[in-house]
Amino acid sequence: MLAVPSHYVKKVEAVCSTCPPPPPPPPTVGQFGGPLAGLSTSMTNLFNGGYGTFVIKWDPIRGLGPDSTQTGCFTCHGAGVDVLTGTAGDTSTTAGTRYGKWNSDNTFNYLDGTGTFPEDEGGPVMHGISNAAFGTLPGCSQVKVASNGATESGTTVTITTTTNHGFKKGQEVQVLGVGVSGYNGQFAIVSVPSNTTFTYTNTNSALASSGGGTAQNLPHEVVPADATVVSTVRSTQLFGLGLVDNIPDADILANAAASKQFGITGVANMIADENGVIRPGKFGQKLDAVSVFQFTANAEFNELGITTSNSLFGAAGEFNPTEHNPQGLAFPTACQPDTHAPQDVSQANMIKMTQFESLLAPIPPAPPTSQTTAGKTVFESTGCNICHIETYTTQQNVKLRTTSGGQTSVIPSLSNVTFSPYSDFLLHDMGSGDSGGIPFIPHGTGQASLTMWRSAPLWGLSNILAKEGGLMHDMTSTSIDAAIRRHGGEASQVVSNYKALSKTDSANLLAFLNSL
């Protein structure tokens, strides 16, 4: 049995003072959550080392951002309370919330301070535990201001809070939402007369008494009142990502260009990869990441508030260089425990995580039966296979990046491998049946659609169903039948074909899908 990598144990000790016990050994070939078959010893070691990095529980000292939704990759990609009860890379019932609003010119506002309408309200990701990990650190208390709790004498403002504030003289606080705007801002505390009052100096003298609001950043982000689009988005399982990463771009572009039946079209989401090269996206519900590295770095940044350097690859500047502030509000300077600027996660650890994810084996389908074989025929005749394309072959001579900036030797387990993810990796208009999402169009590119979604890869579908995870992007479809019927837009004719099936054909189709 493989031992936990020694560097992982040391890493855990460095990351936080209250970490759980070391996890079980990484799964081996053939085990659920194990690596691809046929890996060399050196590649297996990369998988095991990356596993140790993937399951780290982050805290503010090591770079967990103030705008975090969770404390580690495993929470969204592990299907368990922790690594002792789940499997790294697995599906999860954890979902994220995205928000934004339409502008008057029908462009979309991500409420993140960018674009034509630069309103920064912390969008488009709502960070459900923002600041929670910071509340026990000096300078990070979060308290409400009493309804009449802001008064002024000369230039000295006294703030009265509804609970013990825990602030100290000299520390910076953020006063937000107090009725008279002149009381709001970031200030150094001049005195602390009691545990529910503190004072600061304000250059705006003779302001009327006011109150309400907070002396804090919010304990967690909330959906802003002016947001007109709110979407729940499920976390994805990570099995087989390295195979998908190595689908030739030309194959995805060919899918987009192909003539299709039943009114189906589909578009590739052409975006810049981590090196600035425009390529079709392959990962994410909106196909907003080209590579495993980009997918991982974006998740680290958007879900954990962890910034990432891109200097190892020769690209200018940083990949995700600047932390977002909760609700778009400045974070108190006294509450910045991170000592790892400019990036929170080292390039080496980013590479280790992508190595682990790239070497994760896909979940194999169940052995075929006469019913599932018949169901596959129905799958094709109904038109499901137009968007859920079965097979691809990876490119030749695949290598992975190393922590030193070089490349591994060729990995046969990722090279010229035929596999079956069941997706065209295109975006399709799903109509009103699957609307409510944040648009896929990048900032500043004009019109956006809420109803465009990738064709979800169907491999591993049985695993999602076994863990009682709902289907579709928001997890609200509780069965395969419900998910199929919810398809609209481009898929309307295919849904009609499905509804017209005999009971036998329908049962066979569902059995086939349940076997994936």
Language-model region placement:
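Periplasmic c-type cytochrome electron-transfer domains
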Residues: 4-142, 216-516
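Small/polar beta-strand repeat architecture
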Residues: 142-219
